[in-house]
Amino acid sequence: MSNLLQSIPEGRIDFAGQKLVDTISKIVLITAVVISFIAGFALQDIRVTFGLFGASTALLSLVVLPPWPMFNQHPVKWLDSKGNGKEKAS
Amino acid sequence: MHSIFSRINNVSALLSSCTMALLAAIALSTLVFNADPKGDLAIASIKVYPGTTRRYAKTKQDLAFVNFNITADLTPLFHWNTKQLFLYLEAEYINAQGVKNDVVIWDRIVRRKEDANINVAGKNKYNFRELSASFKNVPPANYSLKYNVMPYVGYLTYGEIAKTVEPVAFPRSQPRV
Amino acid sequence: MFTEEIKAFRRLGFRHVLLQALNFATVIASGLMIWKGLGIITNSESPIVVVLSGSMEPAFYRGDLLFLTNPVSEQYKTGDITVYKIPGADIPIVHRVLETHDVPPKGRKAKEAGEPASQLMLTKGDNNYVDDLELYQGLQWLERKHIVGKVRGFLPYVGYVTIAMNDFPQLKYALLGVLGLLALLQRE
């Protein structure tokens, strides 16, 4: 099964990208809740609330889920394998 | 957040907590609206005829026929979390055996604010019969119009719109002409 | 195909597998505890139910979630929406109370003991034209003992997952299988 999973493109992003995604989704979702609640309450229409919330969720997943290049600008730089080749004798 | 699967997982976890919070906020916001509109209810006439019902097809029994007038403005009950109103007219009486009876004789579902200005001259929708099959010696009954607000999300509320000032007596059973 | 998984198991070690199993059991046990605890608080054998039929439309649609209570001290009133289960019927029914008749306890002894009136009820679905007599399977009236609870709160659509699982059993097994595999193979 893991072979199967590995064959699907996983859309990996780097560590800085992960942090960015985390922050973006938190901010967007919480503001979406607050704004859609206030808008719906002000207009006295619950459809406004769920429309706004649904739209912002769709937009968020479009921004956050695909591995856009902006989430891959800080690739991990591994050290050369040469220097680590020697093992210290104890 | 490394792969797309873990991102979907994390975002949907956050999304479900946010949705829960939003739904809870909507349910709680209903507390602000505590309109309790009143209206008028008048019983125009009551007749009692012998008849049969599906339930007791073979027993001889009395059925009461009630004509009533209702006027009420229920638009204040419609707020952003009101899905529909359920209106019902019920008769309450305690018969000679001490049985307390509540019988719904008419109801209506109101789904839009535009339809919430109620002005009905109607008669009972449902069979109105006594447990003992006869309205003889049954004390006068009170009639009241009640509502149930059903929300999109949250809890159900109930209230009373109107009640007859004095109990209305049942007339003698008369043969149907 | 499963050689990888077996390898993963070996690498994780026996203790780790046990720990995962324990985690899994904790999740199930706490779920059961919450359910039973709610049942005690609300005095209802199933405090949350999913609407299975359309007989209360447009109030409740299939898949809506209802929260019930069944207070001991309270009598049911007309207009209350109740969930009841007739002995012999497989599924509970959600319908509105149309008539109540509180018959006082018979005999002076029972009266002095302050026994509550036994309540006879008749229900009807908002979307049905006639009352529920035919659903009662030969009973004339609904009684307190048949009633699971009174609807207090409402959450739309959420229960649709369970209906989907009932309609398509494959979905249920697929979901259970995937969840089980994930729980066992997750490496934290």
UniProtKB/Swiss-Prot annotation, chain C:
GO terms for cellular component: signal peptidase complex. It is found in: Endoplasmic reticulum membrane. The C-terminal short (CTS) helix is essential for catalytic activity. It may be accommodated as a transmembrane helix in the thinned membrane environment of the complex, similarly to the signal peptide in the complex substrates. SUPFAM superfamilies: LexA/Signal peptidase (SSF51306). This is Signal peptidase complex catalytic subunit SEC11. It comes from Laccaria bicolor (strain S238N-H82 / ATCC MYA-4686) (Bicoloured deceiver). The gene is SEC11. Its main location: endoplasmic reticulum. Belongs to the peptidase S26B family. It is a single-pass type II membrane protein. Catalytic component of the signal peptidase complex (SPC) which catalyzes the cleavage of N-terminal signal sequences from nascent proteins as they are translocated into the lumen of the endoplasmic reticulum. Specifically cleaves N-terminal signal peptides that contain a hydrophobic alpha-helix (h-region) shorter than 18-20 amino acids. The chain crosses the membrane at residues 21-41. GO terms for molecular function: serine-type endopeptidase activity. Keywords: Endoplasmic reticulum, Hydrolase, Membrane, Protease, Signal-anchor, Transmembrane, Transmembrane helix. The active site is at residues 55, 95, 132. InterPro entries: LexA/Signal_pep-like_sf, Pept_S26A_signal_pept_1_Ser-AS, Peptidase_S26, Peptidase_S26B. PANTHER family: SIGNAL PEPTIDASE COMPLEX CATALYTIC SUBUNIT SEC11. Residues 1-20 are cytoplasmic. The lineage of its organism: Eukaryota, Fungi, Dikarya, Basidiomycota, Agaricomycotina. PROSITE patterns: SPASE_I_1. It comes from the Eukaryota.
